[in-house]
Amino acid sequence: MARYTGPKVRLSRRLSTNIFENAKGTKALERRPFPPGQHGRTRRRSAGSEYLTQLQEKQKAKYIYGLLERQFRKTYEEANRLAGPTGENLLRLLELRLDNVVYRAGWASTRPQARQFVSHGLIQVNGKRLNIPSARVKKGDVVTLSPKAANMIVIQHNIDTLDHSVVGWLERAEGGKQVTVRTEPAREHIDVPVREQLIVELYSK
């Protein structure tokens, strides 16, 4: 599936969020906390910008989790069929993607890197290799690094140096090279800068 390959810093500035979780994006937002372009510093959102604000929240969620529109819409429709708040359901389904679990486990420094690890067959679920980034894990699933991945310098470096602790719905084992899905993530365990209710309002129009 095609992914966004354009200027990442520019996109992060447009959405006012470091959506690709890299140091370059963080520095750019600190240095220029306004949209790109000739009039970015002084440009105001139009008075009728409710739709634009809602659209921006959807775009942020799409780019953070690496989905294209069709896949994102399909996930939203599934979330809407579930019991409970649709917005929270949406974020929960996105969090349970295998590539996101690899990122949350601390094996990858960014979600795009996590997606690459999964696509290259470096991840196992319940003892079997799974190379589909969008595959969804469930409570009780055990996600591990393949023997090859467990010996990769880049992954060991990430485990040793990344400054984020494993989220509450995952449990680490095997020196950080295995995680078990303890439960489905609650909203308070999801730290993405997305106002999910605005996405619900957008799709409800």
Describe every region a protein language model picked out.
Residues 1-105, 132-205:
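Ferredoxin-like alpha/beta domains used as RNA- or RNAP-binding modules
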Residues 113-115, 201:
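Short, hydrophobic/aromatic-rich beta-strand segments within well-structured domains
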Residues 117-118, 137:
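Short, well-ordered loop/turn sites that connect or cap secondary structure elements
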Residues 121-125, 129-131:
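Glycine- and Gly-Pro-enriched alpha-helical subdomains that act as flexible
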